[in-house]
Design a protein with these regions (language model features):
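Lipid interaction determinants
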Residues: 4, 17-144
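Bacterial N-terminal signal peptides
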Residues: 7-15
Length: 144
């Protein structure tokens, strides 16, 4: 009888561990092959549309090159990133086309993205970039 209990506990442990691992892998995979458009940024007391009057920042994660590409609401944006489970950090941004940007959103975007330490994807499929547990930026998937 004791052997049956031990066997059931061992099988249950393996089963639940594998379910958790596959859920995390699927969630990590969701960050790739998608263009993400910013819909919220913390910090400024200016309306979101006022920060980004011409276009919203977008990001695309390249898994093979471990780089993120897109725009910061005005100029191009490109940087390396490090992803380990739910931990996420961005490297120094590469050079961009220097245009004058209305609204001040470009600087806010660059300041916030350098503070990011983790990410989550919620039930609605929205990507939150967090500083600790605090969401600093939220992105929605762009329809292709």
């Amino acid at each position: 009888m004791k052997n049956y209990v031990i066997a059931i506990v061992a099988i249950s442990t393996v089963f639940f561990s594998s379910c958790k691992a596959s859920k995390e892998t699927k969630s990590t995979a969701n960050i790739y092959d998608t263009t993400w458009e910013l819909e919220y940024i913390s910090g400024p007391r200016i309306a979101f549309d006022g920060l980004f009057p011409n276009k919203k920042p977008q990001l695309t994660f390249d898994q093979k090159e471990t780089r993120v590409y897109g725009n910061n609401g005005c100029n191009g944006y490109s940087a390396s990133y490090t992803l380990d489970g739910k931990k996420l950090s961005f490297g120094e941004a590469g050079p961009t086309t220097m245009m004058f940007c209305d609204g001040g959103g470009e600087q806010q975007f660059l300041q916030q993205i350098n503070k990011i330490t983790s990410y989550t994807i919620d039930k609605e499929g929205k990507l939150s970039l967090n500083e600790g547990d605090v969401p600093m930026m939220r992105f929605k998937k762009v329809a292709k």
